[in-house]
A protein has these predicted regions:
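Subset of outer-membrane beta-barrel
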Residues: 1-184
Length: 184
C-alpha cells in the first residue's frame, strides 16, 4: 500500500490498526473489530533514459495493490489481495555499422508481467495489558504475540523479442521472440 511504500518498503515491523500489512501476516490480528479494510493502490513512475546520442522518456501508471483485510473475532484476522510481482516493458533500438553488412539496427523489446495473489491469516496468542507506575504517573502498556502466514500464487505472461534489421536488402532481417507463461 502507499502507506508502507512511503516508508521505503520497510513494512515488516510495523503494526497499524487501519492498514493491511501484507509483508507481515501476523499483523492481520491487530485490525480493528467490525471494521474491514479495503485498499486499492496505484503507482506512477516517470523515467528518463539518456545515452551520448539519444534520450527517451517513459511513464508508467499501474496498480500497486488491491487488498482486503478482515478482522475475525477478538484475536484473529485475515487478508487477501492481488499485486504485481514483476513487470516488463522496454523497447530499444541500437543502430550499428559493419563493413560487410553495412547499416543495421539491433532491436530489443519486452512486455507483460507476473502478478501475485495472496491469502493470509493471523491469530493473537498472547494479549496482555497492564499499568506501570512511576513516581507520579501511570502508563498503560500492552504486550502481545501473534502468528500469521500467507500463501501466494503467481501468474502472468511476458515476452522478450530481439532482432536485427538490415538496410541492405541482400541480408535477411532476423527476429527471435521468447514468450513465458507463469502459473505456479
Amino acid at each position: 500500500s502507499a502507506y508502507y511504500f512511503g516508508s521505503g518498503g520497510l513494512n515488516i515491523p510495523m503494526v497499524n490498526y487501519n492498514q493491511v500489512n501484507f509483508g507481515n501476516p501476523a499483523t492481520y490480528s491487530y485490525l480493528l473489530r467490525h471494521k474491514p479494510i479495503f485498499s486499492v493502490g496505484y503507482k506512477a513512475k516517470m523515467i528518463q533514459l539518456n545515452t551520448a546520442t539519444d534520450n527517451q522518456n517513459t511513464n508508467y501508471l499501474g496498480l500497486s495493490d488491491f487488498v482486503m483485510g478482515l478482522p475475525i473475532g477478538k484475536k484473529g484476522g485475515a487478508a487477501f489481495g492481488i499485486m504485481p510481482f514483476s513487470t516488463v516493458g522496454y523497447n530499444m533500438a541500437d543502430p550499428s555499422y559493419d563493413s560487410h553488412a553495412g547499416n543495421h539496427t539491433y532491436n530489443y523489446a519486452g512486455n507483460g508481467g507476473v502478478n501475485k495473489v495472496f491469502i493470509g491469516a493471523s491469530r493473537k496468542l498472547i494479549n496482555r495489558s497492564f499499568l506501570a507506575k512511576t513516581d507520579s504517573t501511570k502508563m498503560k502498556h500492552e504486550s502481545s504475540l501473534s502468528i500469521g502466514t500467507n500463501a501466494y500464487y503467481l501468474f502472468g505472461t511476458y515476452s522478450n523479442t530481439r532482432g536485427v534489421d538490415f538496410e541492405d536488402f541482400t541480408y535477411l532481417d532476423t527476429r527471435s521472440e521468447i514468450n513465458t507463461q507463469v502459473s505456479d
